[in-house]
Amino acid sequence: MTWICLSCMLWPEDLEAPKTHRFKVKTFKKVKPCGICRQVITQEGCTCKVCSFSCHRKCQAKVAAPCVPPSNHELVPITTENAPKNVVDKGEGASRGGNTRKSLEDNGSTRVTPSVQPHLQPIRNMSVSRTMEDSCELDLVYVTERIIAVSFPSTANEENFRSNLREVAQMLKSKHGGNYLLFNLSERRPDITKLHAKVLEFGWPDLHTPALEKICSICKAMDTWLNADPHNVVVLHNKGNRGRIGVVIAAYMHYSNISASADQALDRFAMKRFYEDKIVPIGQPSQRRYVHYFSGLLSGSIKMNNKPLFLHHVIMHGIPNFESKGGCRPFLRIYQAMQPVYTSGIYNIPGDSQTSVCITIEPGLLLKGDILLKCYHKKFRSPARDVIFRVQFHTCAIHDLGVVFGKEDLDDAFKDDRFPEYGKVEFVFSYGPEKIQGMEHLENGPSVSVDYNTSDPLIRWDSYDNFSGHRDDGMEEVVGHTQGPLDGSLYAKVKKKDSLHGSTGAVNATRPTLSATPNHVEHTLSVSSDSGNSTASTKTDKTDEPVPGASSATAALSPQEKRELDRLLSGFGLEREKQGAMYHTQHLRSRPAGGSAVPSSGRHVVPAQVHVNGGALASERETDILDDELPNQDGHSAGSMGTLSSLDGVTNTSEGGYPEALSPLTNGLDKSYPMEPMVNGGGYPYESASRAGPAHAGHTAPMRPSYSAQEGLAGYQREGPHPAWPQPVTTSHYAHDPSGMFRSQSFSEAEPQLPPAPVRGGSSREAVQRGLNSWQQQQQQQQQPRPPPRQQERAHLESLVASRPSPQPLAETPIPSLPEFPRAASQQEIEQSIETLNMLMLDLEPASAAAPLHKSQSVPGAWPGASPLSSQPLSGSSRQSHPLTQSRSGYIPSGHSLGTPEPAPRASLESVPPGRSYSPYDYQPCLAGPNQDFHSKSPASSSLPAFLPTTHSPPGPQQPPASLPGLTAQPLLSPKEATSDPSRTPEEEPLNLEGLVAHRVAGVQAREKQPAEPPAPLRRRAASDGQYENQSPEATSPRSPGVRSPVQCVSPELALTIALNPGGRPKEPHLHSYKEAFEEMEGTSPSSPPPSGVRSPPGLAKTPLSALGLKPHNPADILLHPTGEPRSYVESVARTAVAGPRAQDSEPKSFSAPATQAYGHEIPLRNGTLGGSFVSPSPLSTSSPILSADSTSVGSFPSGESSDQGPRTPTQPLLESGFRSGSLGQPSPSAQRNYQSSSPLPTVGSSYSSPDYSLQHFSSSPESQARAQFSVAGVHTVPGSPQARHRTVGTNTPPSPGFGWRAINPSMAAPSSPSLSHHQMMGPPGTGFHGSTVSSPQSSAATTPGSPSLCRHPAGVYQVSGLHNKVATTPGSPSLGRHPGAHQGNLASGLHSNAIASPGSPSLGRHLGGSGSVVPGSPCLDRHVAYGGYSTPEDRRPTLSRQSSASGYQAPSTPSFPVSPAYYPGLSSPATSPSPDSAAFRQGSPTPALPEKRRMSVGDRAGSLPNYATINGKVSSPVASGMSSPSGGSTVSFSHTLPDFSKYSMPDNSPETRAKVKFVQDTSKYWYKPEISREQAIALLKDQEPGAFIIRDSHSFRGAYGLAMKVSSPPPTIMQQNKKGDMTHELVRHFLIETGPRGVKLKGCPNEPNFGSLSALVYQHSIIPLALPCKLVIPNRDPTDESKDSSGPANSTADLLKQGAACNVLFVNSVDMESLTGPQAISKATSETLAADPTPAATIVHFKVSAQGITLTDNQRKLFFRRHYPLNTVTFCDLDPQERKWMKTEGGAPAKLFGFVARKQGSTTDNACHLFAELDPNQPASAIVNFVSKVMLNAGQKR
């Protein structure tokens, strides 16, 4: 053991007399100078045997210098620090001399043990410090009198280490007694916890830096302990590189400097000296960077950046030479909170052809929090990879959009000679996921090739998985085999002693070759579609990982070994690859007592897969993927429909199943094995070998049930093992405590776990996966103790402070626990940790450190079985967790989404047995392929059939509620961020660009604004449909000559393919990004991504990327050439969007050449008629889940050809099916088809009306009252032009009841009119139906007051000559004007476009320039821009779930608060809330447009067919399925387009199939209800027969659909949970239907095929249920009619109270009240808020009150996503007693303040007061308060 004096920094030996030299005479063959006289020694001389000092023999007597031995590090390979030492990234350091440091004896040096001490000089240089690092077994240093650092090299001998640990423990006990607290910074070792009474686990991977929050937690804990007693000391224990100790010492030095005192100055100096002398030379750049972050945040020199950053490019300047001929093959792995979120393709860079390489991430990858970016080099021929560089940073400290790291800033690379000295790495960020303009120069040269085969196991191999579950088995016996597939192999390895070195080798060391790996790509969702994890490859994972050096042959196993492996693998569902699924489950359930269970940290690589084929009971195979309107729902993205799951830090399950962490060697494991555990896909979950506890001789080691990353993301904590197992193990959570105080600690396993708060997921896949894992958790935790949460650890610490004995685990035996290492942080936690970090920096006062970390703590030990530790806060918000509502069978209660567990009343928490995981859902895992079984580890179910996962919830002590930190995570919002006017471009942070980005900005900004033009169209996210609002009313401005049209196109061939094989997959070879196709217009500013494409949080994407001057980088290279033949139908359609604006100013052209304007090429005639059958491509209305490629507004008119071309369909379906698009006022351009002038106007039937709309929702300008309301759009003949059919809005007909809610203003266009939404081209100029041309066409735009002109031309009068298109929008038209100037720009020049915008049209402002101003009360500020101060009806309408958009319908799920005396302007009746049985519900809206109702006339097909590249029957056109391009994320362009094959000619399809599918389509008006909410669907179905169903647009997962269906019996879990209330609601189950490149399918069902359309899906499931609980029963009548027949009058007070009401308000602040409530609490909170400096920034939130409680939704995601306060926690609600007002930052009248007081989550005494200010004058604070009081009163009466 080495001791060092800190006062002089000298070793004890250095204080002794100088040592004399031991000279010997030597003949020098090489010239060497004499050390004394400096003359050359020519022949003989003397040299010292010890220090090699040389001199002449005559000079020997003059030698005075002491003999100093050389530093040992000189003999150690310089590469030893390069790679993580704990056997991570095996093969990464192979070319550097090996990954693990070799023992010093191997290099010929002498190992220095405590008994052999070298004489070292003072530590002043790197060599000496390296000597310290490498030479001694154990280094114990008193950094200060009260801080002791104990460090041990990772390569040291284990026996010596154990003995040294014992010596240290004895020394500490003898010297400090019980007054020392040990902080373990490395892997947990059982012997450490045995030897020391007080241990806190804060481990993180070696050579890495800890999370910023963890640094805060450590400092706070140290300070608390040291301040508790002057005799207390802190011991920092570390095994590995001493950089970990350095980070803590430096951080604490800065931390203690906050409250600097003179008596601590010496301590701080000692810490500084220790850090600089001993740590800096051996530390990593990232560690120094984090110390700098911490110091800067504490001092205020670094301001918190709360904005999320989207990473678009990683540019490596200078090509490292990792290949023999130069060059390298890099690929990136990006981790957020140590969770993999992205894997790039492999770039092959020749050594001499490039000076830099750009790795482009499309769409931009959302990064927030602690980020680790690791760049690997994939070796060319060997299955190995090296680390090129590694860099860690935290986004809170990144303020520039261009960040450059030099070589000296890059871990690993900073001392790697292969990385050029001038090399640097540049990161290009933006504030949105869209491609950045102006970055064309970053495109790599032709010599750079990219391999997107990221399913290569070597690429998927994650380096950090094992760290979270690994322990360094200090004193335990070496397990006789690896505990599971440690390195990604399919089989575990039975370890045997190596005869040479005594190390443990492995039998069956090799894994199956790659070719032998079963390809489960069919069952894995594309990584790119969900989280941008990989690039184009949909093959996400494979099973095997080649071991470097392993032979290719698979060694045979003895029968005993096979049995052992089978037993081991039974927990994984692997069973050596050939056994069936039944065997897996039975294996698991009949597992012997000591057998292995599914490891909890193993992963389900089948992403979001829940279902199995065959034998399960129908009622137990339900997906139940709840998709919307849940209070705690996914924050930013949803589903794999092109979402950026990375927004939530979600890890694709195929990406990494658990927090990546460095995995140290299991004791005795052969050091040559790669220990980067493979996270392999292919449907096999893997468990890291070193994860299990000790095993006894007779059985395999205990392994915890399988676990996936999503579970960690969902905030679940990992479970301990079964109590019957030999040794319970604990794990840790990387970021569970949002406050960041104790985000990575470990606890005794058995202490009761409190229910984690619901966490926002990243995607629907994550949602499913969370449920998948929760199934196991429920099983595990019914039988396993849980690790206590952080807060308990905090209390543990305080109990130590109080000198209480450390609480023993509640398990029956002592628990040497596994290290609790970083669990993946959920995105919510990451966000909250950043926000909390900000607050922490303001709140970290060491003087008060002894106080509890959190203001709100529950009384420890208050519940049965509770440990003395207080509860851990689960969330920074005051949300309540939801009760366990899902069983293993995969059921999820209606109303709850996997992605977004709905908070439940606190009382429900108490029913959770403490041994169970508190997961929002218990879910059935699907393992390994399509025939997956559910692995239930419930002992009681062992005798059950394999497919009957039953739940047995053992009774147990009630779970204590979780304590909530008093910190309300509130990002510091500037007033401008809180402004309620989204039409204003938010001010962006200064663009501090560096590197390649900087020089692009000025030019682009200058280019974007030209003198006589409106401001550049700054794109803003329109949350309603994923668009970006263009704030320029001019589409024809020079900078945007063409406007992209997000029209989705489906080739007829493709449609036929899909129709012929409804359950199959379209053979679509190239699914390129259509969004890019439309963005790549020359000179076009990307005006709007296609609807429901990019799912970026609305509040995040407001930075105009055009301001960066960055041009999209389109991998598909789909440039739409403005001239020449279009290369594809997509391109031609895209040109159509451009043709309008360009033609606007051009002279009218005859219809004889329509294609020149519409498609850019001649459209061949079919059936002889050109004009009549021509339709310009028009998207569907956004209300429809599909975009129409043929402009028929999804069949706004009958799809049949006109009378002169073929039989016509009846006109009635026009309303029932044709009007599904909601094209009420006008059909699509194709409506100009040859409909005879005598064609009767379709009558408005009660086919379907949105329940979400009622008259109250829509108001318009006062003058609209006086005008006649239009009822339907008609096609008629205009006098004077008998041959031209005209479509006008009937302005003189009285409003039909069905349209009353929309028909407010005759000058409003049809609601959600698809044709208006993207293309206003009603046809080329002069589009006579028989070829007649219209001369002198004019374009006139009549605008109502408050509505900006839709056209460039002055507003004119209606003209009745030539061809007229009276384009009008109604308030419900969210899609009008989806492009800048779309209203006028896309109208062909030859049309009279009487474009009229109603003042209240929510979407007119969407892209019509900056003239729009958002009206207060707009539920989604990003979504609507109202004009002229008129608030849109949607603004008054209470709620829009976040997907109010994908459909374009802003489906309001709840009515506004009743304001009795006040009626809405312009309406004659009081506001009434719609309900399923109300008239508005039945008739209020036209029949929705079925997504696949895309009907093309022959002219359409004639025009489109030639544009498809049809090769061998494979259509290279887009698969119009609404899925994103392979790269996922924001490149999703046409989220809703599904092919309609009912009208396509199908040469080889069966007429029966076609007829039946058409039948399903024809009934779609009964079962496709896009606008209804979940509650309305339940109300419609709960009284129906089993099999009844409704498909609606998902309001949570944009672009997806929700399938609600009635089942015969509720899931078992629901029954067991004794849920109060009407169980009939539980009979309606909810599933998510996702859209993808290959069509639609049930989300998370491996045995579900892709269908080309919803109709095909419905038809197939009506024949065979597949993964559904039962077959679908296709309805023959509208359920809304039945609902009307069976129910009384709607909108009664009781209904309103039950359904709830909502509106938008300003969220002002949340203030802790301790136990105060009542008016005093509101008064106090108001006073504190108004007195605060700075005053809190108000944020617009959606305030919903229902019988369940109060739900707040921050639609802009500025502050939070959703917070739910169960009604039983709300104790008071009222106005401010002093009637103070809130002054709005944007001006306007002061608003009344009101608030409610609610108990904090997990607390029975502490309250928080949440303050709000009224926003909408039509929803006064008094009305809200009254309604809340009524709801509370009503709930009290029921109780």
Swiss-Prot record:
Sequence ranges assigned to domain Phosphatase tensin-type in this UniProt record: 129-301
Gene Ontology CC annotations of this record: cell surface; cytoplasm; cytoskeleton; focal adhesion
Basic and acidic residues compositional bias, start-end: 1065-1078
Residues annotated as glycosylated: T1156, S1271
Location(s), subcellular: Cell surface; Cell junction, Focal adhesion; Cytoplasm, Cytoskeleton
Function: May act as a protein phosphatase and/or a lipid phosphatase. Involved in fibrillar adhesion formation. Essential for myofibroblast differentiation and myofibroblast-mediated extracellular matrix deposition. Enhances RHOA activation in the presence of DLC1. Plays a role in cell polarization and migration. May be involved in cartilage development and in linking signal transduction pathways to the cytoskeleton.
Name of protein: Tensin-1
Protein species of origin: Homo sapiens (Human)
High-level lineage: Eukaryota, Metazoa, Chordata, Craniata, Vertebrata
Gene from which this protein is expressed: TNS1
